[in-house]
């Protein structure tokens, strides 16, 4: 087993144990920052639909504290590309080839103002350990 695979397994186990300790207030610093920096215009926020004991971003969207917030979820394409399409609370989601939920009806894709990026861990140099697909790394390198 490669080192990254071992780390993914280790940190997934840790995240699973800590998942139920996360409170709604977890997002308060982010809410304050967004409201302070973007109070005059709409904010295009990309996120992920939570799965596998990830921080429940749905709680953030339901708070209503962020004014003029537009949510965009990733959609994965056949060529290993990822794009972000708008999603509203009652919009239909479909399961993609990796078992993740993504918008079923696609809007124009956008480059988000702010991105919430899933991760398993990060190190002292702020290197992110994701799930190994490289989608976010490719997206960030492109944009």
Question: What spans do the regions from the language model cover?
Answer:
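Conserved phosphate- and dinucleotide-binding cores of soluble alpha/beta proteins
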Residues: 83-143
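N-terminal active-site beta-alpha-beta segment that forms phosphate/nucleotide-binding
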Residues: 1-102, 107-110
